[in-house]
Amino acid sequence: MLGALLGEEHRCGYEGLERVEGEDFCYVPQTDVKSLGEIVYLLGCFRDSRETLSVPDLAEGSFSKKLWSTFLSYYEPGHFAYGLKPNVDDRGSFTEFLRTPERGQVSINVSKPGITKGNHWHMSKWERFLVVSGTASIKLRKVGEDAEGNQFPVDEYVVSGSDMRAVEMIPGYTHSITNLSDTEDLVTVMWANEPFDPENPDTYYEEV
């Protein structure tokens, strides 16, 4: 496509079904063989992706990546933006942004001033928190007790949007995030290694 836009398109002719050197037709040097059913299925997934939040297979050279780029090019101006569905309560909001079957999901968390969220742990799920606006205290504590029967120590990180650092929520560690501001909302990008499944939330309450 880039070559065609630059006036450097690939050209060929045909003898029957065999492609030969020529000037009659433009062609794409990379081709994929897919059934009509496969193409229709992928186009349906692309169409629904704004609702499902799913990101298709974007592996280098994959047919899905090529078709996805072509699909997007057909959006008309004025249709590039779409709404998301925030889960809102008196603490703030939590909005899923992107979901992938193999690389988890990305969400945006907003916490009102002074609010603490979390105080739970996961068996297999792990997360990365990145504060992009505001200042937060993120605390983690290993679940269980040490050899003397005492709780494990709390590990605390104070992070802010002015000095971005990612903090990992490790499986088996209860964790919380607190907005340290009295006036400003805290905005955090949260990545989890697996999409949220309401049938198997893997979330267990325990105060840090």
Range-by-range predicted roles:
Residues 1-84:
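Mid/C-terminal beta-alpha module of Rossmann-like enzyme folds, strongest
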Residues 80-119, 125:
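A short glycine-rich, His/Asp/Glu-containing loop-to-beta-strand
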Residues 94, 118-120, 138-139, 166-169, ...:
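Short beta-strand His + acidic residue motifs that chelate non-heme Fe in jelly-roll/DSBH
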Residues 95-97, 117-123, 130, 149, ...:
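Short histidine-centered beta-strand/loop micro-motifs
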Residues 103, 116, 125-126, 135, ...:
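Active-site lining segments that contact anionic ligands and/or coordinate catalytic metals
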Residues 124-146:
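Glycine- and acidic-residue-biased ligand/ion/polar-headgroup-sensing regions
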Residues 144-172:
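Short acidic-glycine-tyrosine-enriched beta hairpin
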Residues 146-153, 178-208:
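Double-stranded beta-helix
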